């Protein structure tokens, strides 16, 4: 979401743009040709020995080839050490065992980043860990903050609406603006811009590439389903209720059963960046579409997206692909896809077969009108430069 804005701003060559790209985001930043900063750039060997030891321990079981071991060790270790310093060793271990990375809020490390980089403006998203920590630190450093809110902010509003969290918010639509203002945000700070990450969805070359993908893979008149994989936490990271980590795999099993029961279905399964692909039957009707597949192109090539709480559902709706929301996530209330007109139904896992049977073969929907967001976000940013 930040990369399209940073790319256009850097191309104007009027300001120096540095992008903090953590873990899997680093390759996206590199691919855009932007100046990349990572946690490895801020390791201080004289004080970080304990942190790096934590990092090596936590990274030992990782198998993600997209992220270097050094960056994984630095990110996990520095973040975990910050957690220990805030809550104590025993509580840190308990929180990490329950929440994993959702327990992190590495304020001390982001303070180190701002002290070294000395930016005139910080642009963040509403992500709850490092970017929230940046906002906290920027306030202490008296650096203005522009926050790009990706979606509905149902959970994040708890801190977005706090005093002086950001100097400006860029939001998806009027509904989100009203929600933030009602929750306590200054209406003069909230700007309806759209989401820059979605601009690429309507590019004519992307649309044409979707048609070409169907032709290349000989999908022809097949009905192509897409399942975007998600990780479901055992506990909601901000609310005190329990999740079901098995829900995504159970939903995928139902999709596989439906696919293999028919000869006119293709099921595309898309792991998240950094996520290991699930074990699936070897069958030409089941296709793993990894991170090397362009998501925007893929969305123009499929007919139905079946999803839990993921932004892929919103992107699918914006290109005119039908969306079915599967219930069972701790984030269901955070993603009101039916209420927003994005998903045409929301169903429990047990109803997947029926929901697909009545929708397979229906034409794509008319995509909603939306205007490019990157230029609108830049207008907001330039008020602070």
Residue spans for each PLM region:
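Structural motif
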Residues: 120-121, 168, 224, 266, ...
């Amino acid at each position: 979401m930040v990369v399209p804005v940073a790319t256009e701003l850097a191309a104007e060559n009027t300001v120096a743009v540095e992008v903090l790209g953590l873990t899997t985001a680093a390759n996206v930043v590199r691919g855009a040709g932007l100046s990349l900063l990572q946690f490895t750039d801020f390791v201080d060997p004289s004080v970080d020995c304990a942190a790096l030891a934590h990092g090596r321990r936590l990274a030992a079981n990782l198998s993600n080839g997209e992220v270097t071991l050094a960056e994984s060790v630095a990110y996990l270790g520095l973040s975990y050490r910050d957690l220990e310093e805030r809550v104590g060793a025993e509580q840190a271990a308990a929180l990490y065992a329950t929440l994993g990375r959702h327990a992190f809020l590495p304020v001390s490390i982001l303070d180190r980043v701002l002290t070294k980089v000395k930016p005139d403006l910080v642009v963040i998203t509403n992500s709850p860990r490092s970017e929230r920590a940046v906002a906290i630190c920027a306030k202490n450093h008296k650096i203005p903050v522009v926050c790009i809110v990706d979606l509905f902010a149902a959970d994040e509003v708890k801190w977005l609406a706090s005093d002086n969290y950001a100097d400006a918010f860029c939001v998806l639509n009027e509904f989100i603006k009203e929600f933030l203002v009602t929750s306590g945000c200054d209406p003069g700070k909230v700007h309806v811009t759209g989401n820059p990450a979605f601009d690429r969805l309507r590019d004519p070359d992307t649309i044409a590439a979707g048609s070409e993908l169907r032709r290349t893979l000989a999908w022809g008149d097949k009905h192509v389903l897409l399942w975007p994989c998600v990780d479901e936490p055992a506990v909601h990271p901000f609310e005190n209720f329990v999740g079901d980590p098995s829900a995504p795999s159970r939903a995928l099993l139902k999709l596989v059963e439906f696919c293999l029961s028919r000869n006119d279905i293709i099921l595309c399964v898309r792991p998240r960046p950094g996520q290991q692909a699930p074990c699936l039957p070897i069958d030409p009707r089941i296709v793993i579409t990894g991170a090397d597949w362009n998501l925007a192109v893929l969305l123009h090539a499929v007919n139905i997206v079946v999803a839990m709480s993921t932004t892929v559902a919103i992107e699918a709706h914006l290109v005119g692909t039908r969306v079915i929301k599967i219930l069972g996530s701790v984030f269901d209330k955070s993603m009101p896809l039916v209420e927003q007109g994005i998903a045409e139904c929301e169903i429990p896992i047990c109803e997947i077969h029926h929901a697909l049977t009545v929708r397979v073969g229906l034409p794509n929907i008319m995509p909603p009108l939306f205007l490019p967001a990157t230029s609108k976000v830049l207008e907001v940013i330039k008020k602070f430069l």
